Amino acid sequence: GGELTFHGPGQLVIYPIIDFRNYGFSSIKEFVLFFANSIKSVLTDFCGVQNLKWHDEKAGLWIEDRKIAFTGMHFKKFVPIHGFSVNISNDLSYFSKIVPCGIPDCIITSVKEETGKIFQVKDVADKIVAAIKMFDNNVLCRR
């Protein structure tokens, strides 16, 4: 993964700009997997998306050969720069104009595409915030 992505309406973008050591994480991988598993849990339990799997080398959550959630992080002094994005109900045609994440022939999908249901980004965000119980409300803010 890496290189280039697209952010737009109908997509949830999560930038957890915190020093992960202050929250008990012992490694970058543990921090990234915690967030990925929280997102996976909400997409499965709340949205009904099935067969989600995390791929380290492709930096995201996948359903077979289709990418639904992305991570792009660089860490500076144990604080992540950038974060995660999740396709909820966004227009996927924008991805056809780029090579998403530097992966040729990458198929991009969304919650809407996978389930046929339209979820509000705010509702999914609220569920993800609830899934991340170790953080207090002052750390995670929504726009």
Q: What role is predicted for each listed range?
A:
Residues 1, 6-9, 16-143:
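Catalytic beta-strand/loop module used to bind and position nucleotide/cofactor moieties
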